[in-house]
Amino acid sequence: MNGQVKPVDAGQTIHHKTPKVFLLKGATIIPEPGKVIAEGEIVIRDGLIESVGKNVEHPADAYEIDLSGKHVYPGFIEPYFIQEEEKSMDRPRGNQQKQKPKEIATATSHWNPKVTPDRHVLESFTLEEKQTENLRNLGFTTAHVVPSSGIFRGQSALIHLGDWSPGSIIKEAGPAQSIGYEYGSWSDPAYPNSLLGAVALIRQTFYDAQWYDAAWKVYKRYPQNNDQPEEDRALTALNIHLKNNNAFLFETGEELAALRAGKIAEEFDLNLWLKGNGYEYRRLEEIKELKSFIILPLNFPKKPDVATWEAALQVSNEELRHWDIAPDNAQRMGEKGIPFALTTSDLDDKKSFRKNLLRSVDRGFSKDGALASVTVTPAKYLGLSEVLGTLEKGKIANLMVTNGDYFDQKTTIESVWIEGLEYLLRSTPDADARGTWLIQWSFGEEVRNDSLKITGEHEKPKGKLIASEATIPLKSVSLTSNNLFGFSIKGDSLNLAGIVRFSGTIINDYAEGQGLTPNDEIISWSAQRVAPDKNDKKDRKKKTTEKASTLVVRYPEGAFGLEVKPTQPEIILVKNATIWTMGPKGILENNDLLVKSGKIWEVGKDLSISPTVKSSVVIDAKGKHVTPGIIDCHSHSAAFSINEGSQSVTAEVRIQDVLNSDDINIYRQLAGGLTTANILHGSANSIGGQNAVIKLRWGLPPDGILFEGAPKGIKFALGENVKRERSWGRYPETRMGVEQVIRDAFTAAVEYKNNLGSRMRGKGGKLIPVRRDLELDALVEILNRERLVHCHSYRQDEILMLVRVAQDFGFKIGTFQHVLEGYKIAEAIAEIGAGASTFSDWWAYKYEVVDAIPYNGPLMENAGVVVSYNSDSGELARRLNTEAAKAAKYGPMSRADAFRFVTINPAIQLGIDDKVGSLEKGKDADFVIWSGDPLSMYSVCEQTWIDGTNYFDLDRDSEVRQKVKEERNQLIQKILSSEEEDSQYDSFKRGRRRGPNEVEAYSCMGGDLQ
């Protein structure tokens, strides 16, 4: 530690001297949740609890403190105390402008400044008295300190919250390594500048640590065969955490981020902790399966502004529901048996912690559960159970003293004890001044008899003097713990200039003392209480008991989520429909479709269901059309992050790491008959990230929407997006450079592949293994034809360039995307077996597409290229059926061949045509029921089925819309009737707030966030 502990001011150390032995007696002691000791006693000696219970032995040297009427609890433990100050770090921090990894690294630090697992949070720690005072005022006596920035942020520490001194440190090497999904922005050249990149860097760093450990083991055993590995203090520290099974504490901003952390923890066998976010109630089952300890904030949303109907338009149903459910998050987690501790973190005003906690208790969160979440639970997981968390013999004397039940709104926290030292916070007056008093007072020869009426709160009384000539409001009223009572009045009503001050002592119903006029004349006074305070309604507002939300969580949460997850019937029979098989049978009129256990069983006439079937659905589709589910070969929906634009080659990043299964676009696209989508990385990179093929299973978590068994793919890009000026001077800046970047990457991948093979064969484990590189792993998969390339492309010269590169390196191009000059070189595309996924009739949206024509698709199809139409848009994906109709218009093509452009053809391009794309026996039961011909702009999608499960139904949608409308009105009325303070949010100045799982739409057309 670098001298971080400031010396204690000698003037503040008097309470460090005698006495060191205390006897606290007469209190109601709550030694742990669920236990109460009435009129109990605690002996504290040298900072430790010597005894606790009823009628304990009284040490002769103890200083006795009478706590009659008080409650004593274990001191609270803050599990997530953020250390903000990092200026004195001895390594570069933040983003480094246009510097390569080797240029920013020191000899032993990690190349990326956001990776600092070797950092100890106390290296640059400065504890501000205001910070500790704020926490002590809430009853906290201990804190788990965590670093605030970076990706691998460093090791935590445990401290006491008393006066800062070397003895305040409980454990300098705390129990957790803190991790955050931190990244820059598009204007920032440093890696990573996206969530995609942050996750990839986390994974690569863990693999680096594994390799580093293995490399040193081999080197130490066989130094004669190997060069000494470069020392890396970051990886050394990370390996220590891994070997000690320390916790890895991931900070999460929403509930799906918790599941993302769970995938990383599963991959690397981590002891997972989560810093929560308040949205956990949305995915409780999945979060429970993580078996993680969660540090939970009480950051309830402010009351939405719905005061006018115009303002209410800016508030989504998701926001309204979150406002109603969020205060029950802790209760619902407790009911699921998920272990958690509560934190003041994320609160702008720390004082609101207790208010929010009591609000949760008021709504149904158990008092014992609430108390456990700030005492025994954090103590258990932070490794402090032997010394803190309960009031027991031998434990550190960290405790909290209140003037009543902590969970009573009127109760005040009077003091905390930290290591056996008392920190007075505020005192509750022993006497109660409220009531009506007859007061006699005299100065000089004048004697007066008036009435004094004291009302208000016990600790904050107010009142008035009722004299014969006037009723005079008291200017101030005070009452202290030693029964000293004081008040003042303006003297002008009594023909006295200035303020007249009174003070005295209350004993039961009698009070007496003296006053002082502005002229220093002494006033003698005495008073007798003749009536208690009646708690007039004007003085004391009756509090309405708040009830827990009655809303049922939807999947996903929001307006169109499902209250019950969809189930798959055993048998589905669609009768009397016009069926577009998209297979050899073509279009069949007045036919039936039979589905069993999620698979197409038969297409034919007069099909039937056995009467013994337990679960079946029969649909009369007379006059309707049934098609395979539509497939979008180029989408950017359902992802939190699309482009890692900091480098030209980012093959290590994966869309599957950032899937957003709660994206409302999924539901909207289901309503257009879409069932499968190829979610691609953006187009800012010569070699971008790995794709994710999904099925639009609305309501399932991210893992649940992945298309099982779909071939792996990756996004490439050519042209303006890759080399344009927006790339911040990043190489390449010309179209020639793009080719060289791609060739250079594959040359490195070939060398990497060869090294992997030679090292595995060489010298029987006596050579240091090749470091696993996630970027090169993906490129090797391409070389091995295990990963398809999907390439953003427009111009014929660039398309031909990539064709030649693919031939040189022997990899497979799955599709050229956009490919608007593909009609010029269709034969070359067909020759290598690549597909073309294009737009129907888009052109002139930038100069690069100046030669685009609407006949492009049909012309390539005629040349033997497998062609599909895609959306590259969350909106256009809702009507790909009418995009297919344009193929018939510009073809000319048959209706069936045109519809192939959005069904079987994209399935072929993605390598999933054995499962989807046509209605044939054995394939997945992904189908759509249309009101009419699917190529007609007048036809409507009525039902969308995936794997024999209904995910969209037009009739159900109408019912949901009505229910949502009614629910919205009810929530708005609840907000308007709420006693909660009005929000200061100005809807019209800032626009509508987005929920945690809402993301902006991306399109490859310009490569920008639209």
Task: Describe each model-derived feature in a short phrase.
Residues 4, 407, 476, 507-558:
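Edge beta-strand at a domain terminus
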Residues 6-9, 14-20, 29, 33-75, ...:
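Histidine-rich, glycine-flanked metal-binding segment
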Residues 18, 88-89, 96-110, 118, ...:
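His/Asp/Glu-enriched, well-ordered alpha-helical/loop segment
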Residues 24-27, 429-450, 461-469, 511-521, ...:
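Tryptophan-anchored aromatic micro-motifs
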Residues 27, 396-429, 577, 921-964:
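C-terminal cap of metal-dependent C-N hydrolases
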Residues 127-281, 412, 418, 505, ...:
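Polyanionic/metal-chelating signatures
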Residues 439-506:
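Central antiparallel beta-sheet cores of small beta-barrel/beta-sandwich binding domains
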